[in-house]
Amino acid sequence: MGQKGCPIGFRTAVTKKWRSLWYGNKQEFGKFLIEDVKIREHLRKKPSCQGAAGFIVRRMSGKIEVTIQTARPGLVIGKKGAEVDLLKEELRKLTGKEVWVEIAEIKRPELNAKLVADNIARQIERRVSFRRAMKKAMQSVMDAGAIGVKIQVSGRLAGAEIARSEWYKNGRVPLHTLRADIDYATASAETTYGIIGVKVWINLGEKTSTANANTGATAPAAQ
């Protein structure tokens, strides 16, 4: 199952944190879930959030706290905080509740699967060779200290008549090992030939224990 299922969902509450931090009863759960989806969809469409890797939603006594994980915090905050204030107001109108927005900077974007996948997709859209984009991204990930990386692209590669998939792998990416801290993300490139899908798996090491799912502590994987 490790090869077929989503690595993030497979490890949630084991070595990965939940991305929605709240509890709802039978009457509230569906409403809260739809609200979370609307919040994330709205943020993904915002130009200021284009460099964002993820969004964490917390709920507390009628208030919502949204944490934006990004490698470019200045873009999200805007001049004198104008962009983040606009985001708060838009989310307040969307949900009808008071919304707090916090920014969490990603210190090492080369080790974030979402940012790597988005970077490859944007290069493919600019007509850069998909093999060159994959190899360059893979080298950057390994140079940043990853234990292993796997990158796959699918679609009408280089304008081919028949769609196919190609992948490259470097190092160890053990998808069955639950203690392995695997970051996974997808992205899509819109080209004149159609959509090119991009998938990225990054092995960041091994969690020292399941308790570290809440702390994010990692230990280097055994060589």
From Swiss-Prot:
**Ribonucleoprotein is among the record's keywords:** yes
Q: Which GO terms describe its molecular function?
A: mRNA binding; rRNA binding; structural constituent of ribosome
* Domain KH type-2 as annotated: residue spans: 39-117
Please verify whether the record's keywords include Lipid biosynthesis.
no
Q: How does it associate, per the subunit comment?
A: Part of the 30S ribosomal subunit. Forms a tight complex with proteins S10 and S14.
Q: Which family does it belong to?
A: Belongs to the universal ribosomal protein uS3 family.
What this chain does, per the record? Binds the lower part of the 30S subunit head. Binds mRNA in the 70S ribosome, positioning it for translation.
Question: Entry's HAMAP family?
Answer: Ribosomal_uS3_B
Q: What is this protein called?
A: Small ribosomal subunit protein uS3
Question: What organism does the record attribute this protein to?
Answer: Chlamydia caviae (strain ATCC VR-813 / DSM 19441 / 03DC25 / GPIC) (Chlamydophila caviae)
* Gene designation: rpsC
